[in-house]
Structures are given as structure tokens and as C-alpha cells.
Amino acid sequence: MNNTPVITAVTVSQRIRSSSNQPSPEPSSMTAFLLSMQYVIEEGSGEGWFDDDLILWLTVTAVITGVLFIWRQLTYRQPIVSLRPFTDRNFTLGFLMNAVSGMSLFGGTFILPLFLGQIRQYSAAEVGTTMLVSGLVMFLSAPIAGRFVRSMDPRIPLVVGFALAAYGVGLGVRVTAEWGFWEFATLQAIRGAGVMMAMIAAQQLSVSTLPPELMKDASGLVNLVRNVGGAIGLAILTTILTDQTAVHLSELSAAMSVANLQGQDMLAGLTSMMEAQGLADPEGAARKFLGMALRRDAAVLGFADGFYFLALGCAAASLLGFLATPGKTKPASGGGGH
């Protein structure tokens, strides 16, 4: 569970209360909004979304407290989170792109180990070894990407970085049940280099045209949205994996039903194989084996849809880069991490 939005809310609330004796609904509305939103996006899929009363009421709570919080920031003379940076075009675009970079970073780190564990039955050590490629590439590319971003218009590395990330993650659309270390190594290397470049460039673009007095507020918003984007991305991926796997299983089951000639042939072949092994109930064993194979194939197709979602998000962020305006070249505030 991603607790950064909650920690941010609590920290800001404590600072406001300690610096003022006047009661204010702002800290509590922000905390309620972030807590409710985070629970809904992370638990909604598993609880059936609005079929669950708690999810429904927390959604209503998130909407009401979110609107209240934004209204207070726009009308209060000393808001705890200034929304003035959103009047800058580059910051608004960079804000959205940082959300996508968080989604790609956390989403890729979520979906790959899940595939390796569920489909390939990898041990924790084998999963860690495979995932090491992504972390290593991001670690090694961070200083190179930082220098690259600072040496030119940040829009160029932004577009290139997200395009690389989209291509890398897009390789996963062709995933099969036989994919292992080397297939995912290529995907992770391209994705890792692209995400690192995009993260640094998005951070740079966000503040490239802001006046100095808005830098502090902008930095906090950017760091927050990257983690919130990651949490939202994980919730969407979880929903995609659950729903699309069910859809694919239904389609595959229909194609392989006993009423279908291809399904009959496959079942007959499996039954003969089970008979040759001397099983007591060869047809029952064949049906069980076929069901397991269909569930595995449906899960693989669901993972492919998850990779497609991540690739689509990165591609959209790359296109947003063309809407940004040229800004001053400034040192990036940080290279990010993994």
C-alpha cells in the first residue's frame, strides 16, 4: 500500500496546527480526501467497486472533501497548498506527466513480479534476479539522463523518454507463458532508461517557467502526484488483470468447449495421453489439465492487456510533451530513484 499521500497529509496538518491557533477545515479535509481516495482506488476492485457500501460512501466522502479542499485553497488568503502553479502551462503538463511516470514506475514494478510468480512459478530469489535489470539500468542511467536533460530543451528528452518507456513496456503486449529472464531483460532495460529520462525531464519541465516564489509549492505537488499516480496506476492494473482475465477465460472456454470441433479434438488427445499414463479417470484428468491450461492462457492475455495500458499511458504522455512551451534550462532537482 502506497502511504506517501497519507504521510504528506498528516505532516502538513501537523505543521498548520502548530503554526496557528485558529481552527481550519483545510488539514482535515485534505487528510479525509487523500485517505478516502487512496482506499477507494486500492481496494475498490477487490470489493466490487460501488457494489460495496463502504467504497460508495468513501467515494462520496472523497468527492465532497476534495471539492471543499480545493475551494478553500482558492479562497483562503494563506492556503496550505497553493494552487497558483497550475496557472503555468508547463507546470500543469509536467504535473500530468509526473503522474504517468509514477504510474509507469510503480506499475511496472508491480506487474512483472506478479507475472513471474503466478505464470512462471518463480521463487522470490528468481523474481529478484529478474527485476534487478530494471533497477540497475535506472541507477546507471540516472546521471547520464540528468546531464542529457540539463543540456537541452527538456521537451526533447521528455518526449524521447516517454516514447522509450512506451516501446519498452509495449514489448510486453506480446508476452507468452514461456517468457523468462532474457525476454523481460530487454523490456526492463528499455523501460528503465525511458522512465528515468522522463522522470527527470518532467520534473525539469514542471518548474522551467515558474517564478521563484512558486517553486516550493510546485515541488511538493510534483512529488505528491507521482506517488498518487502510482497508486492510481496500481488500482487500474489490478482491475485490468482481474476483469480481462475473466473475459479471456470466457472466450477461450467458449472456443474450447466440447461442442466445438477443435475442443473435442484437444480433449480427445489429452484423454489418450492420460490413458497412456495409466490414470484411473483419464477423461476427468484431461478436463482438469485443459482447464488449468485455459486459466493460465487467460491470465497471460490479461497481463498483456496490463502492459498495453502502461504503454498507452506513456505514449499519451510523450504526445503531451509537444504541447509544452520552451523554458529556461535549470538543474534538475533530483534524478529520481527506483
Language model features by range: what are they?
Residues F33, T92, L96, S101, ...:
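Hydrophobic alpha-helical transmembrane segments of multipass membrane transporters and ion channels
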